[in-house]
Amino acid sequence: MKKFVFRFFFFSVFCSLFYVVLILLYGTIVPASFAVNFNYFGGMGFTRQRFDEVSKIKNVDLVVAGSSHAYRGYDPRIFKKSGISMFNLGSSSQSPLQTRYVLGKYVTKLKPKLVIVDVYPVLFGVDGLESQIDLISSGLIDKDIVALSFKINNIKLYNTLLFGAFNNEFHIKKQKLSDNQGDTYIPGGYVQSFRHLQFKKTRFKQNVNISATQLEAFKAGLNELRSQQIKFVIIQAPFSRSNYASYQNNDEIDRVFSSLGEYYNFNKILNLPDSMYYDDSHLNQRGVNIYNAKLIDTLSKRGHFRKLSMNN
């Protein structure tokens, strides 16, 4: 029996070491197109550059969190003209699970007077895998990321987490900043693009599905802001009319968000032409200029930005 236990222990240690070596070789050598159950390629939306920058920032008036709608939709330069300092904590496909994480990690340090929680309803129905991989691939690995990874529970995520931990320590592989040509990173976490890509004007009708896990995380994140006495507003940034109209339960989604706090759906406030969009889901710079001006005006009338400006 002792011999069996010893052999089993030795075999387990050998397999574990072999697995680690295999993941390191796999992540270093295998091209992204051939990767299976592994993804450490990231490069979407300058996530690494954004979170490297925020480590050097303190005390801003406004923080924005959310998906690519956030980092492509809120330009710090426009807010600065109104006397508002801001930082954008958006990341690619950021679901409520990750929004709660990034706010929990940075809001105490940034000490914002207001948080804009940008919501893209589609991401309330995902498992959070894509966004989690993006954060890990950008060097964000701590006990909370590990705990969240176990909650999502995906083999691809575990492999990426293992490689990411080694890469943070030994710098095996350099991570890209962005895959998208024509994108420019602007200090404060924003990604600027003047491009306008052709996109489909007709889409299949569908419903937005909200998972209980994502909704629970969203509510928990808002409650954590309340517990720190940080004011927040929930914002749905505009996306193309054809895309928005394809969802049949938009009013139901509005009721969900309205029940959780001060909420504005700018798909119903603005009616921007397709030329103002980078693609069917994101504004380009011309659209951002109009959207941000309207947002500042709307929230100023509710007393938010007026108070911030008076405090500066």
Language-model features, listed with the residues they occupy:
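A structural signal for isolated positions on well-ordered beta-strands in alpha/beta enzyme cores
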Residues: 63, 116, 231-233
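Membrane-embedded segments
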Residues: 65, 69-149
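Secreted/periplasmic serine-hydrolase-like ester/acetyl group-modifying domain
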Residues: 132-230
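C-terminal regions of proteins
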Residues: 247-312
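Hydrophobic membrane-insertion alpha-helices, especially the h-region
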Residues: 6-28
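Membrane/wall-proximal cationic-aromatic binding patches
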Residues: 22, 26-87, 91, 95-102
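Residue-level recognition of beta-strand->loop/alpha-helix junctions
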Residues: 90, 236, 265-267
